[in-house]
């Protein structure tokens, strides 16, 4: 696939997602990084977003709960280039009814080449990166060219 570029602004649009067994860990991570995260635009699946708002006072765009379609909403926002970073603390040891949605979400984050943290260590590396608070250009699929090729 042909690529183009997209510039991610210094003020990031960050999606927060977590499975039930990981919510406490994600909340602790958000609290630890509250001052920095409050400088960015936060989105989250329903339960996670409400827990983050209640615990931190940070405004969060709350979507549907993951099993009710929230993971797919986040995926759609990624495809629309409205999410710059995905922080997704998922539980690899417990299956969830919406596992196909989880796989689709991670696939879209990979297709659109956004940074993804699936555990606390990776989230720490990501938020401590010099790129986190600055403008950065990433390579993404050239969808217009892709569509042109498909319509030939």
Curated annotation (Swiss-Prot):
The active site is at 71 (proton donor/acceptor). Substrate binds at residues 19, 23, 45-48, 65-66, 98. The keyword Thylakoid does not apply. Residues 1-152 form the MGS-like domain. GO terms for molecular function: methylglyoxal synthase activity. Keywords: Lyase. Belongs to the methylglyoxal synthase family. This is Methylglyoxal synthase. It comes from Yersinia enterocolitica serotype O:8 / biotype 1B (strain NCTC 13174 / 8081). The gene is mgsA.
């Amino acid at each position: 696939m042909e690529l183009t570029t997209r510039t991610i602004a210094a003020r990031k649009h960050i999606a927060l997602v977590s499975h039930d067994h990981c919510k406490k860990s994600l909340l602790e991570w958000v609290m630890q990084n509250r001052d920095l995260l409050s400088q960015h635009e936060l989105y989250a699946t329903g339960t996670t977003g409400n827990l983050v708002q209640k615990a931190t006072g940070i405004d969060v765009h709350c979507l549907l709960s993951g099993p009710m379609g929230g993971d797919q909403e986040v995926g759609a926002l990624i495809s629309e280039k409205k999410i710059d970073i995905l922080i997704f603390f998922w539980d690899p040891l417990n299956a969830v009814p919406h596992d196909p949605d989880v796989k689709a979400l991670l696939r879209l984050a990979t297709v659109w080449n956004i940074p993804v943290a699936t555990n606390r260590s990776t989230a720490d590396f990501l938020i401590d990166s010099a790129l986190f608070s600055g403008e950065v250009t990433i390579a993404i699929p050239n969808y217009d060219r892709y569509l042109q090729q498909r319509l030939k």
